[in-house]
Amino acid sequence: MEILNNLAERVISGEKLTKEEGLQILSIPDELVMDLVEEASKVRKYFFKNQMEFCSLINAKNGACTEDCSFCAQSSHYKTPINAYGLVSKDEMLAGAEKAVAINANRYCIVVSGRKASKEEVDKIADAIKEIKKTYPIKVCCSLGTVDEKDLDKLKVAGVDRINHNLETSEKYFSKIVSTHTWKERYKTIKKIQKVGLSTCTGGIFGMGESDEDIIDLAMTYRDLEVDSIPLNFLIPIPGTPLGDKHNLTPLRCLKIIALFRLFNPKSEIRLCGGRELNLKDYHDIAFEVANCLMAGGYLTRAGREPGKDEEMARRLGRELIKNGASFSVSNE
């Protein structure tokens, strides 16, 4: 296909792909997906060489969420098989950081359920961050829902390195999956994060019934925002949620989406997270010809694969893991 001609060279030179070209990328025939991966891989190698980063998270507050996100097990609107609990202790947050270091994660994210963390919760998390930064050689991220500038300043002083807040899908499609808050609220939160000078991590979930245009709109929004990290999640249908019986993704469809985000956001980290194992299947390793980061050690309400398998993959692919500001080859031990 013509869209594949000199595609990587155009992106590397600084050319911005158009929405029409994005539509062509997502409609590439399955037999040409490996050619698309090759082009996107050239872009990844140019900007990130052979480096790979692991991150890990702690589900620091689970369930009882007032929001009605159709994909989420933690919403109080649905009957789902989860164990709700309040904010964990500082010791538990520190223990999570220790586990993250042990699996060679370069980042550790403290995640809480709910639309917005309370002032008390922010204070406790900030206190834990200070202790983590003194104790462990790891970058600390937070995902606390909607945050105001005072909270962000407090977290920044504590030593947080990055804030996660996902847009999830396009502005046009968002109201189809969430009714209790707006896409604009999430967008404004990202702008606040950038305003205080913190690194941004913001991504999406795919397989929720969105169109090709929705996917491209999200990729272009992140390009306009110049975000640092884009976590890509692929729907894990959760019984009890409105999307509990939806599963229309194929591995090749996932590869097209990953390649699209790399080509539209060449300088952003492309981080594969929830649903990567379930949806990519035998193409899992191939996806990391394009992506350069991953979430290791499990997700919020679902287990991932053993971290050792991700290290084995990094070794097979000849990648160097980034850890504590340096990169190293994964040993065979």
Curated annotation (Swiss-Prot):
It holds the Pfam family Radical_SAM. It catalyses: (4R,5S)-dethiobiotin + (sulfur carrier)-SH + 2 reduced [2Fe-2S]-[ferredoxin] + 2 S-adenosyl-L-methionine = (sulfur carrier)-H + biotin + 2 5'-deoxyadenosine + 2 L-methionine + 2 oxidized [2Fe-2S]-[ferredoxin]. [2Fe-2S] cluster binds at C109, C141, C201, R271. Its EC number is 2.8.1.6. [4Fe-4S] cluster binds at C65, C69, C72. Its cofactor is [4Fe-4S] cluster; [2Fe-2S] cluster. Pathway: Cofactor biosynthesis; biotin biosynthesis; biotin from 7,8-diaminononanoate: step 2/2. Keywords: 2Fe-2S, 4Fe-4S, Biotin biosynthesis, Iron, Iron-sulfur, Metal-binding, S-adenosyl-L-methionine, Transferase. GO terms for molecular function: 2 iron, 2 sulfur cluster binding; 4 iron, 4 sulfur cluster binding; biotin synthase activity; iron ion binding. It comes from the Bacteria. Binds 1 [4Fe-4S] cluster. The cluster is coordinated with 3 cysteines and an exchangeable S-adenosyl-L-methionine. Residues 47-276 form the Radical SAM core domain. GO terms for biological process: biotin biosynthetic process. InterPro entries: Aldolase_TIM, BATS_dom, Biotin_synth/BioAB, Biotin_synthase, Elp3/MiaA/NifB-like_rSAM, rSAM. Catalyzes the conversion of dethiobiotin (DTB) to biotin by the insertion of a sulfur atom into dethiobiotin via a radical-based mechanism. Belongs to the radical SAM superfamily. Biotin synthase family. Homodimer. This is Biotin synthase. It comes from Sulfurihydrogenibium sp. (strain YO3AOP1). The lineage of its organism: Bacteria, Pseudomonadati, Aquificota, Aquificia, Aquificales. The gene is bioB.
